[in-house]
């Protein structure tokens, strides 16, 4: 928001001669040519960097499979607001600062001020909506994730922009305007105390308080659930379960014990030389459902375990260990039986082999399917947790960038000259707030590997294509 702590108004009776004298004494620009060139270069670089960085964010979310989650549409809308700040607000703020007056006319002054307040307000309301989205995904993991569709997220984004407009536009009705015949007109907001305080509270302090309280609540819930999850994971020594619900044998068990435990099949010879294959289907069915229930509870708790990390290298190592164990178990699977009739034993052995192979194939397929589902869920959970941390950093940086400006501006509204900071310092706080629009892509690049990979893919893929051509 291009706000001036001082105004250049003069009494209507003195406008004949004193006004012209003061305007002749006052230079059009308060900076030397070298300072003008330096400031123009720095701010121009900031504008270009903001546009390019946020365009990359939009392209990454819309094209990367890893960023296809509906909630990432919030980042698209937030990046769009930053792009609009860099294109429709910052260039005119720079010109107004360097020229020391408003050159672009009264109509564009009204539009410029309205857009400036709107984009600043929408940024923090976006962050407030994102914090609520993260809170619901933590406290209502299963139910809210089912409702979190692209259509619902788009509806929330439209609501965010409407709320921002409602907060921003009404106070702009009473803008301060210099007389039309002023040689150096100024484009300034209402300087009255009620407007300064209402705009500061509505555009910054109220959403900021909501955002901070929500994230404190997220942290507390996550910490409590993580402690509960660690207690649930505690199991007695010497006992464990496989992914299909069967009990694993002790570490020192022999091959025959391992085979019997893995297949849960038993062969008994009757008095008449016939063989009976007893498949403990009911026992396995019971164990499977019991373990599935435990897995579901564990998965729900893992939704809010912020400390969990899931990397592709760890998944490959775990998968290779499980496949090696499965191969070892299948090799160790053996049957021993005795019979008085060789033909009968050969036939029974053949039937037993086919039955055991079908059983092993069923459990192996079921286990692979369940392992794949759990792996996908864990990857999604880990990505959610990493991005929750990234968004907490984004919100913290936003508050740090904009708090000095809104704090000093609200102080000026309360006690005027007694609390007024030096004009140079106030302008510095004002431009630090604008710098925030360029920082989100940097934060995504540093703290989120999905964005980092996507940015590299977008930039270097295009370079490779041009080099090949």
UniProtKB/Swiss-Prot annotation:
- Look up and give the membrane topology term: Multi-pass membrane protein
Disulfide-bonded cysteines: 109-187
Molecular-function annotations in GO: alpha2-adrenergic receptor activity; epinephrine binding
Give start-end positions of Acidic residues composition bias: 301-310
Which Pfam families has this protein been placed in?
7tm_1
Q: Which residues lie on this side of the membrane: Cytoplasmic?
A: 63-73, 133-154, 217-386, 449-469
Entry GO CC: plasma membrane
Which residues are annotated as site, described as Implicated in catechol agonist binding and receptor activation? 199, 203
The primary site where this protein sits is membrane
Residues of the region (Disordered) are: 1-29, 232-261, 279-353
Where does this one sit in the cell? Cell membrane
Family annotation (Gene3D superfamilies): Rhodopsin 7-helix transmembrane proteins
Where does the UniProt entry place glycosylation sites? 8, 20
Which family, according to the similarity comment? Belongs to the G-protein coupled receptor 1 family. Adrenergic receptor subfamily. ADRA2C sub-subfamily.
Protein's name according to its UniProt entry: Alpha-2C adrenergic receptor
Species this chain originates from? Didelphis virginiana (North American opossum)
């Amino acid at each position: 928001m291009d706000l001036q702590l001082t105004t250049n108004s003069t009494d209507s009776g003195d406008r004949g001669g004193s006004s012209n004298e003061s305007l002749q004494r006052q230079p059009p620009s308060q900076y030397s040519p070298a300072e003008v060139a330096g400031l123009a270069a720095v701010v121009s670089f900031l504008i270009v960097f903001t546009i390019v960085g946020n365009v990359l964010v939009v392209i990454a979310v819309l094209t990367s499979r890893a960023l296809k989650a509906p909630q990432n549409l919030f980042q698209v809308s937030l990046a769009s607001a930053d792009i609009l700040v860099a294109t429709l607000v910052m260039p005119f703020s720079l010109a107004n600062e360097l020229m020391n007056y408003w050159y672009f006319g009264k109509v564009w002054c009204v539009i410029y001020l309205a857009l400036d307040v709107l984009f600043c307000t929408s940024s923090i309301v976006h962050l407030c909506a994102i914090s609520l989205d993260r809170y619901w995904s933590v406290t209502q993991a299963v139910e809210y994730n089912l409702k979190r569709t692209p259509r619902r997220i788009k509806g929330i984004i439209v609501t965010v922009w409407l709320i921002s407009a409602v907060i921003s536009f009404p106070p702009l009705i009473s803008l301060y305007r210099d007389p039309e015949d002023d040689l150096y007109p100024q484009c300034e907001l209402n300087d009255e105390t009620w407007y300064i305080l209402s705009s500061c509270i509505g555009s910054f302090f109220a959403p900021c308080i909501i955002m901070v309280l929500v994230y404190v609540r997220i942290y507390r819930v996550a910490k409590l659930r993580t402690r509960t999850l660690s207690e649930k994971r505690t199991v007695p020594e010497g006992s464990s379960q496989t992914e299909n619900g069967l009990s694993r044998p002790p570490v020192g068990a022999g091959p025959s014990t391992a085979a019997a435990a893995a297949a849960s099949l038993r062969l008994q010879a009757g008095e008449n030389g016939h063989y009976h294959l007893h498949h403990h289907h009911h026992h396995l069915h019971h164990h499977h459902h019991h373990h599935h229930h435990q897995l579901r509870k564990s998965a729900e708790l893992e939704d809010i375990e912020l400390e969990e990390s899931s990397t592709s290298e760890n998944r490959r190592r775990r998968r290779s260990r499980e496949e090696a164990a499965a191969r070892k178990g299948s090799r160790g699977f053996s049957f021993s039986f005795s019979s008085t009739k060789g033909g009968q034993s050969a036939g029974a052995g053949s039937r037993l082999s086919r039955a055991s192979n079908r059983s092993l194939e069923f459990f192996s397929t079921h286990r692979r399917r369940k392992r794949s589902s759990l792996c996908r869920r864990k990857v999604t959970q880990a990505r959610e947790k990493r991005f929750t941390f990234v968004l907490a950093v984004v919100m913290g940086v936003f508050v740090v960038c904009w708090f000095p400006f809104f704090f000093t501006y609200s102080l000026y509204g309360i006690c005027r000259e007694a609390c007024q900071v030096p004009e140079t310092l106030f302008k510095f706080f004002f431009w630090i707030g604008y710098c925030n629009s360029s920082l989100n892509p940097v934060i995504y690049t540093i703290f989120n590997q999905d964005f980092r990979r996507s940015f590299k893919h977008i930039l270097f893929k295009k370079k490779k294509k041009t080099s090949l051509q």
